[in-house]
Amino acid sequence: DFSKNAETKPDNIAIVDGENGNKITYAELKEKAMEMAFLLESSGVKERDLVTITLNRGVSQIVGTLGILIAGAGYVPVGTNQPLKRAETIYKRGNIKYVVTSRTLVDKIEFPKDVKIIYTEDIQICKSIDKSKAKSDYTAYVIFTSGSTGEPKGVVIKHANACNTIVDINSRYK
């Protein structure tokens, strides 16, 4: 459990970035995630909102995802190579008004015009929130599949379901 590890093993390495080898401890990851949650709230994200995350794999993607969850919102992964038409359909079906991305990607990706862009780099200037607002019945994430019609169809996963899956995986691979 991330929160438990952040409290009991704060100096242990939580992530090793496969791209550049940078390491981040549980304490650092928690602090960055709490700052991201504050940035999201300051940008207008409310509990139970869906927020897309469009980032390359790495520390920023994990910080963004955790920040979304801590803010009590759900995340919707939208790949950096997603065609605009498919992305627009996902945004529309999910009633999504916010995207977390980086300044390096914003010029390379076309986002729907009515979506507010929140940059991961802006957590450098933020405070952090006190505690997670996530609840077991809140949406943790939505995965859009191609569906039988070829149109994106969202599958909602609640925090309780995601937690059960993680507990099961952890028990199998101890």
Task: Say what each PLM segment does.
Residues 1-163, 173-174:
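Carrier-protein-dependent adenylate-forming modules in NRPS/ANL systems
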